[in-house]
Amino acid sequence: GISFGGQMHGLVILDENDKVIRPAILWNDGRTTKECEYLNNTIGKGKLTEYTANIAFAGFTAPKILWVRENEPENFQKIRKIMLPKDYLAYRFSGVHATDVSDASGMLLFDVKNRCWSEKMLEICGISKGCMARVFESYECIGHLTEEAAEKLGLTTDTAVIAGAGDNAAAAVGTGTVGDGSCNISLGTSGTIFISSMTFGVDANNALHAFAHADGHYHLMGCMLSAASCNKWWLDDIIGTGCLLYTSDA
């Protein structure tokens, strides 16, 4: 079978012919400050947490949808499907509009506790449920390769396509971070602290994301959008310079 893991939160919007309407707005795009303020202050952090287990951050998908609605109304009117980056690739392989619970959790459109779309959040964003992909657990088969995909890949049409997971959730499974209370730290373009939990829980201070995880579990995650590059700067420009000066003085 074939599966996908990839960056989370990005907005890919398709028209009635399943054609991409505009370039994807990725996780690290910070244009949605105004939309996040509206969601957190007008809708309210309490309601957002009730609906999705999370508050609005610029990286999440729902604020991006509101940005398109406000700034590109002609594109907003064309939307027939809303997808995440890895799920669009899976669609091109399978012809199926699908997502998994871990990636869906990062959209601010997903009822994390009940592992389904939040009708309240869809209403706030002006999106019908029909625009959303079907949600699967990460290990589930969403379909099989289309004839076109199978021919291009040199595979057969009975090759299963598996839902997969968002990048951090997939990495957590790979590092064995699935047991209750297990934890990992990831330093890349962004930096995360990831804690697996067998039970659903929301951070009362809204500092951590609460997402669905493997095997019916959940996870809490703290994230910074800039991580390894900051470490490199510290090592190269601060620690490195300091060491050179110390050596020179000696």
Q: Where in this protein do the model-derived segments appear?
A:
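A conserved helix-loop-beta module that forms one wall/lid of the active-site cleft
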Residues: 126-137
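N-terminal glycine/serine-rich phosphate-binding loop of ATP-dependent small-molecule kinases
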Residues: 1-22, 50, 78, 133, ...
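Glycine-rich phosphate-binding loop of ATP-grasp-fold ATP-dependent ligases
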Residues: 22, 103-108
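Residue-level structural signal for beta-strand termini and adjacent loop
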Residues: 25-26
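Carbohydrate-associated surface elements
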Residues: 29
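Active-site core segments that coordinate phosphate-bearing ligands/cofactors
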Residues: 33, 40-98, 108-119, 123-126, ...
